[in-house]
């Protein structure tokens, strides 16, 4: 079982992994801001909500100060993967790196930069970060892990990583093939995030309401059904039902990451979410008109933030 772990990116999900794993392993957080690192070193990391404890860990912005690791967990936005992993990629040459990120394509980016074994990871766990040293756990659901086939990751290594996460007090399941789980989360995430980004609504009960012709839940259901058809045509049998995932999440009023990005005019992860479904469908000559339309609308929305500046 891994004893030295590096959390790459300490937002809400990264903070949940860092705090829980710090109870059973030596945990280092690699973060972007010096004040974030100082706060974690001085005060530790508090978890509230579904859990209530404070964990001690080490944090830095300087990769030169980090040791070699048995396991890395990448928790950055998909758009930041290459930038975040590059400075520390050499610290896992004898270990493994788990992507616990949204969407498709992160494992490929990680594998390009490191000699480490890469592990596919998908989590439905959610939380809200109240400060650099306080995260609230909202959904305590499993992380699904499996080998990333191009790096020939041994299943035994995946099992060790899952066992470590469980030992820390979180839920995890090692799978021989994690693509069905990854696609379950992808379809759920692409559908919910796209609608949230365009409506600027949090993930609320409206996302599961199908009572009226105008009900937003009808659009969510159609998006999810379309994603299911693409997955089935690609030969992927889903691990979980994305519609059931949506119904559970819609009770939380959780603001999806792309809603936050749109509200702050940050680049979204749409290329790794709805864009990934649209691309995979197009590559296989399959139809995904709804996901493709929302993908284009969000790209257009992002373009609108700078269009006036470019014209002036």
Residue ranges with predicted function:
Residues 1-52:
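NAD(P)+-binding Rossmann beta1-loop-alpha1 motif at the extreme N-terminus of oxidoreductases
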Residues 219-312:
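NAD(P)-dependent Rossmann-like dehydrogenase/reductase catalytic/cofactor-binding core
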Residues 91, 134-148, 200-209, 254-264:
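Helix-loop-beta segment of a Rossmann-like dinucleotide-binding subdomain
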Residues 5, 27-28, 97, 118, ...:
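Hydrophobic anchor at the start of a short beta-strand
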Residues 179-205, 215-226:
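Active-site-proximal catalytic alpha-helix in oxidoreductases
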Residues 51-134:
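Rossmann-like NAD(P)(H) cofactor-binding subdomain of soluble oxidoreductases
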Residues 102-181, 185, 191:
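Rossmann-fold dinucleotide-binding core
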Residues 19-23, 86-90, 112, 275, ...:
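Short, well-ordered alpha-helices that flank and scaffold nucleotide-derived cofactor binding pockets
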């Amino acid at each position: 079982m891994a004893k030295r772990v590096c959390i790459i990116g300490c937002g809400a999900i990264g903070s949940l992994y860092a705090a829980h794993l710090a109870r059973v392993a030596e945990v280092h957080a690699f973060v972007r801001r010096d004040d974030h690192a100082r706060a974690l070193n001085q005060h530790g990391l508090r978890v509230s909500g579904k859990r209530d404890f404070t964990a001690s860990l080490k944090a830095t912005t300087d990769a030169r100060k980090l040791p070699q690791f048995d396991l890395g967990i990448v928790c950055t936005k998909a758009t930041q993967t290459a930038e975040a992993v590059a400075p520390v990629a050499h610290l896992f040459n004898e270990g493994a790196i788990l992507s616990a990120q949204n969407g498709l394509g992160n494992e490929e980016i990680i594998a390009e930069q490191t000699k480490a074994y890469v592990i596919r990871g998908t989590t439905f766990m959610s939380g809200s970060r109240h400060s650099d040293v306080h995260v609230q756990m909202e959904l305590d659901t499993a992380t699904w892990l499996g080998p990333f086939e191009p790096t020939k990751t041994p299943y035994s290594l995946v099992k060790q990583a899952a066992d470590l996460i469980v030992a820390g007090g979180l839920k995890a399941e090692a799978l021989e093939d994690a693509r069905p789980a990854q696609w379950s989360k992808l379809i759920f995430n692409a559908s919910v995030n796209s609608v949230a980004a365009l409506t600027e609504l949090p993930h609320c009960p409206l996302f599961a309401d199908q009572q009226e012709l105008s009900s937003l839940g009808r659009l969510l259901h159609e998006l999810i059904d379309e994603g299911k058809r693409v997955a089935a045509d690609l030969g992927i049998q889903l691990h979980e039902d994305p519609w059931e995932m949506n119904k559970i999440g819609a009770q939380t009023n959780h603001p999806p990451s792309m809603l936050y990005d749109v509200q702050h005019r940050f680049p979204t992860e749409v290329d790794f979410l709805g864009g990934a479904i649209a691309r995979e469908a197009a590559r296989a000559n399959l139809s995904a008109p709804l996901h493709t339309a929302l993908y284009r609308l969000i790209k257009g929305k992002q373009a609108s933030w700078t269009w006036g500046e470019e014209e002036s």
